[in-house]
């Protein structure tokens, strides 16, 4: 059913071609294609710097893995988020933009910071552009685990 032939690889549950994946994010349907995004450590089979992988399917069973949609940057790794199709160009980014909302997690400094960011595609998910004015929501001064 899929392109995978390894004996222990799931055939009805998406898995990446290589390395470690975390939770799926932002399943969205657009122009007859399902777009699945997932947290992906491209360096190892364990937890590490998170990218957002991207796979597409017409039937939710047969998946084709695409180039990564998001990669770590100065704001940190790419954590959980969602996707929407902006049919009415409410964002002003362009007609029928696919928009990704994600958490940028900077865990390298002495105080971890988590911000909400956006990225978008104007070519049916082939290429992705991070929003120039990221973050769209900054970390609050008070978190649930400690005061900052």
Q: Which residues are covered by each model-predicted region?
A:
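Blade-edge beta-strand/turn elements of extracellular beta-propeller
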Residues: 4-14, 60-72, 123-139
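Conserved Ser/Thr-centered positions that define the repeating blades of beta-propeller domains
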Residues: 57, 119-122
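N-terminal regions that are enriched for targeting/export leaders
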Residues: 1-34
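Conserved small/polar residues in nucleotide/adenosyl-binding loops
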Residues: 134, 145-148
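Beta-propeller and closely related beta-sheet repeat lectin domains
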Residues: 23-25, 79-82, 147
């Amino acid at each position: 059913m899929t392109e995978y032939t390894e004996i222990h690889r799931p055939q009805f549950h998406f898995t990446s071609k290589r390395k470690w994946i975390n939770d799926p994010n932002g399943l969205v349907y657009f122009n007859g294609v399902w777009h699945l995004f997932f947290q992906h450590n491209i360096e190892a089979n364990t937890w590490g710097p998170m990218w957002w992988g991207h796979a597409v399917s017409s039937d939710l069973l047969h998946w084709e893995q695409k180039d990564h949609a998001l990669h770590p940057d100065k704001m940190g790794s790419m954590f959980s988020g969602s996707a929407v199709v902006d049919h009415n160009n409410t964002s002003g980014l362009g007609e029928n933009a696919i928009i990704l909302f994600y958490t940028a997690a900077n865990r390298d400094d002495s105080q971890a910071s988590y911000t909400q960011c956006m990225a978008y595609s104007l070519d049916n998910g082939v290429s992705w552009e991070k929003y120039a004015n990221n973050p769209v929501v900054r970390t609050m001064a008070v978190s649930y685990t400690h005061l900052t």
